[in-house]
A protein has these predicted regions:
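Conserved PLP-binding active-site segment in aminotransferase class I/II-type PLP enzymes
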Residues: 1-72, 76, 97-98, 149, ...
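Conserved PLP-anchoring active-site segment centered on the Schiff-base-forming lysine
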Residues: 64-123, 128-130, 309
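Short amphipathic alpha-helices in soluble, non-transmembrane regions
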Residues: 208, 303-312, 376-380
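Conserved PLP cofactor-binding pocket of PLP-dependent enzymes
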Residues: 215-225, 266-270, 306-360
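Short, conserved charged micro-motifs
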Residues: 299-305, 369-374
Length: 388
């Protein structure tokens, strides 16, 4: 949540640096105009260092990051890609756009992929799994990675919500073969729109880098119009303005995550007074706390809780009001899912729906104020009709 909250003079300084040195907004070429200023390239290097991975590729969005990741592993029409029922619609859209077949798993009490259901869904056609760290809480990565390795399938981490988080000391996104990130306006760090893909494997990185730029190899010794091409592709290039903002935002990431964790701790002290159950966090998790999620006893109470929070001026972000955009059981508009799961898609994921239908989320700001605590407390008192 806080990325847009902390945009300031640092971002402006990085942008000004572009216009003070030729004003080139395209990430490649025009060397004679830009005085050595390549913001996207600089952002990629700094991000890869931060995530402790050798390769990083900046793209136009988190959705683009997923599509580029799938292009790198060369999806064929019969290939199946497994992902979870609770995720933003873009995860499944990227699979469909890559010509893959989306296979959906249930979630568990982490609100992330259920490892047991993941293994059940693996077939001879399974090419990869995309695990999503929803709202900043890590999935059960040890179990999921072990299963992926056993069956020799690619592990892709959709880390759109988890930038800055860790699992057993490893940055989220760097646990699998490929990690994807989103920098849209609502994420922990933002470039307005934008994304990043990180790799351990040079071959996968090279494929992705070419594919995201119409197949260009971007040989620095050749003018762009004479550059060789290794494949077909599309245009998912990040521009220099986004790269400049990304550099400034990355410097603030640790401060932001620390602030979110501090705010979450204070809100948790309020939630513990009420008859609700907190979302499970796997052992070894260092969450980003994009949002705090808790469960109440039934769906009607969840709606009541949401309404009370909203009436006090406390947002609930995506649970439960934006569930249709974040639950595969609502996506009957996609022919590929309709063909696989039928019209009553929701009934195919009863465990997931049971969790989500009783869940409420509170978005976390790094700028915690005592007034917010009072509002949350008042809303929960009214919800449960009991003063604590």
């Amino acid at each position: 949540m806080p990325g847009y909250e902390i945009i300031g003079k640092e971002e402006l300084r990085e942008i000004k640096d572009i216009f003070d040195n030729g004003g080139v907004l395209f990430r490649h070429g025009f060397d004679h105009l830009r005085n050595g200023i390549y913001k996207v390239n600089q952002f990629e290097k700094k991000f890869s260092k931060k995530m402790n991975t050798p390769y990083a590729l900046a793209v136009t969005s988190g959705t683009a990051a997923l599509r580029v990741a799938l292009a790198a592993i060369e999806i064929k029409p019969k290939d199946e890609i497994i992902t979870q029922s609770f995720t933003f619609v873009a995860t499944v859209e990227a699979i469909i756009e890559s010509r893959g077949i989306p296979i959906i798993t249930e979630i568990d009490d982490t609100l992330n992929m259920d490892p047991k259901d993941f293994e059940k869904k693996i077939t001879k056609n399974t090419k990869a799994v995309i695990v999503v760290h929803m709202l900043g809480t890590p999935a059960r990565l040890d179990e999921i990675k072990k299963i992926a390795k056993k069956h020799k399938i690619f592990l892709i981490e959709d880390t759109a919500w988890g930038c800055g988080g860790k699992y057993n000391g490893i940055p989220l996104g760097n646990f699998g073969d490929i990690g994807t990130f989103s920098f849209d306006f609502a994420k922990t760090m933002t470039t307005g729109e934008g994304g990043m893909v990180i790799f351990k494997n040079k071959k996968l990185f090279k494929k992705a880098a070419a594919w995201h730029d119409h197949g260009h190899e971007n040989n620095p010794k050749l003018p762009r119009w004479e550059d060789s091409r290794s494949s077909s592709g599309f245009n998912y290039r990040m521009n220099e303005l986004q790269g400049a903002v990304g550099i400034a935002q990355l410097k603030k990431l640790d401060k932001v995550v620390k602030g979110q964790r501090k705010s979450a701790k204070k809100i948790l002290s309020i939630l513990k007074k009420y008859p609700l159950t907190l979302r499970k966090s796997p052992k070894g998790s260092k969450e980003t706390f994009d949002s705090l999620v808790f469960f109440v006893s039934n769906p009607k109470l969840a709606i009541r809780c949401r309404n009370q929070l909203l009436s006090e001026g406390v947002g609930t972000k995506i649970l439960p009001e934006a569930l249709t955009w974040h639950f595969a059981g609502s996506w009957s508009h996609m022919p590929q899912l309709l063909k696989k799961y039928g019209k009553n898609i929701r009934k195919k994921f009863p465990k997931s729906y049971s969790y989500l239908n009783k869940a409420v989320s509170i978005p976390i700001s790094m700028n915690y104020k005592n007034e917010l605590a009072k509002k949350i407390n008042t809303a929960l008192e009214k919800t449960f009709k009991k003063k604590i």
